[in-house]
Amino acid sequence: MHLNAIAISAFRNIDHVEISFDRRFNVLHGANGQGKTSVLEAIYLLGTMKSFRMAKAHDLIAWNAPHSLVRGDIDKAGVRREIALYLGREGRKARIDRKPVTKLADFFGAVNAVVFSPEEIGMARGGPELRRRYLDRAIFNGDLGYLLLHHEYHRLLKQRNALLRRGERDGLEVWTIQLAEAGARLMVKRRAYLSQIEPLVRQFYRDIAGAGQEVGLAYRCHGLASAEGERDCAAALRELMAAHEAEELRRGATGVGPHRDDVDFILNGRVIRHHGSQGEQRSFVLAVKMAEIEYLERLNGAPPVLLLDDISSELDPERNANLMTFLRGKRMQVFITTTDVSTLRLEGIDTHASFRVSRGTVTPV
């Protein structure tokens, strides 16, 4: 899959730009706050309708503009398509080949994009919400059903929490059963994904840091470590919610379930966020992202688009070189933002396009 061109209008600090891209490497450079990340954000929207920066849709619309427009010309398996996304104050509308999209399934997956940002560099040492967010994004890229299930789980969670806040025991069991069943399906999918990428993470970590390191991933869910399969997980989750019901009524919120789970990154038998050096943590995250790319390529038969948001400033020269060596061996299209082109390792890359970004304008150089 390749993004041939994009048009962006009234989006953050971008008034209007039209950009034609290289099929391999595209470098957007300029000072901070000029619009580099906004271009990556617009690309990501074409595949997900959401910002990877956790912004609300109305926050993406330029000041005093009625709506934003992002339009992409893509080439997927030899078929060219036009994807357009309108962001209005009242919601979003999508079109494919100028026809309205009525089902989300028709839109999602048209652009598979993997983001590697400074936020994700921090997930090895940060809080569990960073690792959950990474995990959910990674699974959704290869499984549209996961996104729908994720939405359903959080809808049920919201309903159950509303009952807990009101202190209503009547009807709580019905929501508990439904939430436990949806939560069990999420947990099984998360565990399956981690088991599939773990050998890849192990391989890439050794490529980066050398042999002799034992690498692992462990899904951590409070009180459910031994439950296997959807049925067992759902039953265990129901029992756990029942056991915590009095406490949850006091707090007005559901305290157990996938929305509270975590992933342990393990190096030589120790959780890396507690015991790993900064270099080990960054190597681990780099290996996890490489594994995600490799997994999606095997699953879909083609690599995703990769969005590297100012990663060169977060990695030392050796890890930058390892990442670029990996990317040179892939057939994927890569978009890189940076404030300093000299930090990039572009040696051996036969073709790339470079763009200067300043005050919301994008100029080929």
UniProtKB/Swiss-Prot annotation:
Q: Which GO terms describe its cellular component?
A: cytoplasm
Name the residues that bind ATP: 30-37
| Keywords from the UniProt entry | ATP-binding, Cytoplasm, DNA damage, DNA repair, DNA replication, DNA-binding, Nucleotide-binding, SOS response
Q: Which Pfam families is this protein grouped with? A: SMC_N
Which locations, inside or outside the cell, does it occupy? Cytoplasm
Family annotation (InterPro entries): DNA-binding_RecF, DNA-binding_RecF_CS, P-loop_NTPase, RecF/RecN/SMC_N, RecF_2
Question: Per UniProt, what is one GO molecular function of this protein?
Answer: single-stranded DNA binding
UniProt record, GO biological process:
DNA replication; DNA synthesis involved in DNA repair; double-strand break repair; SOS response
| Function text | The RecF protein is involved in DNA metabolism; it is required for DNA replication and normal SOS inducibility. RecF binds preferentially to single-stranded, linear DNA. It also seems to bind ATP.
Q: Which family does it belong to?
A: Belongs to the RecF family.
Name the chain's protein.
DNA replication and repair protein RecF
Q: Which organism is it from?
A: Geobacter sulfurreducens (strain ATCC 51573 / DSM 12127 / PCA)
Task: Report which gene this protein is encoded by.
Answer: recF
